[in-house]
A protein has these predicted regions:
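Terminal presequence/propeptide segments associated with secretion/organelle targeting
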Residues: 8, 16-280
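Positively charged n-region of N-terminal signal peptides that target proteins for export
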Residues: 1-4
């Protein structure tokens, strides 16, 4: 599991309770994990985190661009992400006359938002364990190369049904040192527009020096908006597109927090060594 993977995971952090720290796939939250979360202060039904039939948090957390995490915060397609995640798009939109990287940018209306060509936002549709399917032809005598070829071949067979829709992206991802295989399906939106970015003096304050320090003092955020067609489906850029209405958006609280409050993060981490043995 050292390789890059993009699948929605939950990170639980509770001050002073080290044994409860860790990262889990949302669909693998079991009764024990759910019970412990409630003991620590989680107050919602567990299916409010991940559901394939009802709106849930997984519908608000997105893959932004090539692998960053973003979150939907409004019923009009607003996405919050990091400044460094939007950096390339902001750079491409900048010019000598309008240096948005240096000076920042704020849109006052839908019409002023800037289309970010090539930028995508992907919403998770479903996750499915297909281990039994892709390993069904394996033999104990298979070499590692033969094993990989068989699994890859059946993975491609399984993904065939998604190839006709260019706005769906499906991929098979191995987990737990290739002992589990999941197919994850995303709806990919290709009309994404810049709404707000702070100047780099704020968004990139401290650079890489401060990047590994805590607390940090950088305003590392930017705001984009996802647009959809008139049927609220994914589409290429068009002036006729309208702000996307997500299945679920996360309310922003101004109440702050107090010591020992329950805390968790949902997103797309780059990698994890959870459950990795000392043998690697």
């Amino acid at each position: 599991m050292r390789k890059l993977f993009l699948i929605l995971a939950i990170v639980l952090t509770v001050a002073g309770v080290k044994a409860d720290e860790g990262m889990w796939l949302l669909k693998e939250l079991n009764r024990q994990s759910a019970a412990r979360m409630k003991e620590l202060g989680f107050k919602f039904p567990i299916d409010s985190i991940y559901s394939e039939t009802n709106p849930s948090l997984k519908d608000a957390v997105v893959i932004f661009g090539r692998g960053c995490t973003g979150v939907s915060v409004s019923r009009q397609g607003l996405i919050f992400t990091n400044h460094h995640c939007g950096y390339d798009a902001i750079q491409k939109l900048s010019s000598v006359d309008h240096d948005y990287l240096k000076d920042g940018f704020v849109s006052q209306s839908f019409q002023e938002e800037l289309p970010a060509e090539g930028l995508t936002v992907a919403f998770l549709q479903n996750t499915e364990d297909i281990t039994d399917f892709v390993t069904s032809t394996l033999l104990p005598t298979d070499s590692e190369n033969v094993r990989e070829e068989k699994i890859d071949s059946l993975s491609q067979v399984y993904l065939e049904k998604y190839k006709d829709n260019k706005f769906l992206r499906a991929q098979v991802i191995p987990f737990y040192t290739h002992n589990k295989y999941y197919v994850v399906v995303y709806e990919v939106f290709r009309d994404v527009r810049l709404v707000f970015t702070p100047p780099s003096s704020v968004g990139k304050f401290g650079g890489e020096t401060d990047n590994w320090m805590w607390p940090r003092h950088t305003g590392d955020f930017s705001v984009f908006r996802v647009y959809a067609n008139k049927d609220n489906g994914a589409a290429e850029y068009s002036a006729d597109n309208v702000p996307y209405k997500p299945k679920y958006s996360v309310p922003v609280s101004l109440k702050g927090y107090k010591e020992n409050d329950y805390a968790m993060t949902i997103g797309y981490p780059g990698s994890t060594e959870r459950y990795m043995t000392a043998w690697g």
